[in-house]
């Protein structure tokens, strides 16, 4: 029972078992889920960000349990890291804008954040690649996506600064 719950958690309710591009599907599901939470249910972005931080710490343990007997320490079916990484820029965007944007602007921004996160997660610029290559454990699995999410934040902040 515990192993089944852990499996559902680290695979984001089975999304990680999708044969092709499970990370992209997990990022897309996360983006849609967060849009629903923020713009349909009007959840507080601060509460969601705190929840993501809690999920980060739970994930360190859960992913470690999942990969402990595997040869591949970063299996494709583990996509909770995509959830965490994709949630960072979206949550910070929502905190910065306090829900003040029109729906079209929000959808465009979410799409851009999704694309940027996937690019940074796939090409792994430094230090994303550092965590991916040097930490063959749950910390490395998760931190490369956290850093990819922070890259998205950096790009968006740079864009906002340069466009004002």
Predicted regions and their residues:
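Interhelical loop and helix-boundary elements at the membrane-water interface
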Residues: 1-26, 61-89, 118-150
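N-terminal membrane-targeting hydrophobic helices
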Residues: 13-19, 31-32, 39-40, 87, ...
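Hydrophobic alpha-helical transmembrane segments
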Residues: 24-29, 46-53, 107, 111-115, ...
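Intramembrane alpha-helical segments
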Residues: 26-33, 58, 93, 97, ...
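Hydrophobic core of alpha-helical transmembrane segments in multi-pass integral membrane proteins
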Residues: 32-36, 49-61, 153-157
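Helix-coil boundary and interhelical linker segments in multi-pass alpha-helical membrane proteins
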Residues: 34-49, 90-109, 157-164
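Core hydrophobic alpha-helical membrane-spanning segments
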Residues: 115-116, 155
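Final/C-terminal transmembrane alpha-helix of multipass membrane proteins
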Residues: 145-162
